[in-house]
Amino acid sequence: MDRRDAMGLSGSGSYYIHRGLSGSGPPTFHGSPQQQQGLRHLPNQNSPFGSGSTGFGSPSLHGDPSLATAAGGAGALPHHIGVNMIAPPPPPSETPMKRKRGRPRKYGQDGSVSLALSSSSVSTITPNNSNKRGRGRPPGSGKKQRMASVGELMPSSSGMSFTPHVIAVSIGEDIASKVIAFSQQGPRAICVLSASGAVSTATLIQPSASPGAIKYEGRFEILALSTSYIVATDGSFRNRTGNLSVSLASPDGRVIGGAIGGPLIAASPVQVIVGSFIWAAPKIKSKKREEEASEVVQETDDHHVLDNNNNTISPVPQQQPNQNLIWSTGSRQMDMRHAHADIDLMRG
């Protein structure tokens, strides 16, 4: 018996395992047929494939080359665990969700806010919600524009039917009288924008500390001329409220000015630029008149009810309420007719 037979009988490993580089083929045995017949399969109790699994796997099962090399080199490991190492199955790959077309939803199906929205989209949505425009026409965008003045709102502004005018004053005419006469031609408020020319006589009102007026004679250049005549609250366009002021420069360089309290005689042809606009003060007054008339009618009705309850005959005829209304309106019209046709400039 030679050495190779002794190794086969003693049960030691008498075969080689030649593995290729690919590692896909089954192991190859070298030895006599008797030695190959002396090999027997040992059941592997710990094998996950049951007791029928053998030490050598099928060609479809590939072992670990590192374990096979270690087993062949050491010769101490059993042959049934040398090369039958099965790789674990790969983890189930998640099927990628197909992206839907269109804009992503803002809210999920359960009502929660979707996290797919970026921070930029959220930042752009928030200001739009805070600056959301209300319903209806925005204030101040109608036909009747309103302009804020000191402490109140004017019913109409200069942008409503504003019209410029040029007043030409000849030499020797009163500039103040020309402007006042122009303001009384219609129910429009006026304002003096600018003036150019020279005056020979100017009467200016002194401050309240020294009441009175001072008359200046000579040649003075007009630096500025300003005024605004607003329709009075009684509705008469001939009764205006306002004051005319002027600034003059003397030939020696002095500047004088103040409210005009007398004639302002032109020394050269003077041009005055005036702007006229509609101010709806009479409309407010008409509303007040309607309220007063309704109050008078209410009082007369109350008196009639009291007289009927006392079973007394009222000496006042039935047409008296209408007569009172007509008489009050007529009296006011008479007052309007006898209103001053000119503005007293001495009142300031």
Curated annotation (Swiss-Prot):
Protein name, per record: AT-hook motif nuclear-localized protein 9
Location in the cell: Nucleus
Source organism of this protein record: Arabidopsis thaliana
Molecular function GO labels: minor groove of adenine-thymine-rich DNA binding
Record feature DNA-binding region, as residue ranges: 98-110, 132-144
Known role: Transcription factor that specifically binds AT-rich DNA sequences related to the nuclear matrix attachment regions (MARs).
Extent of Low complexity compositional bias: 47-60, 112-131
Main location: nucleus
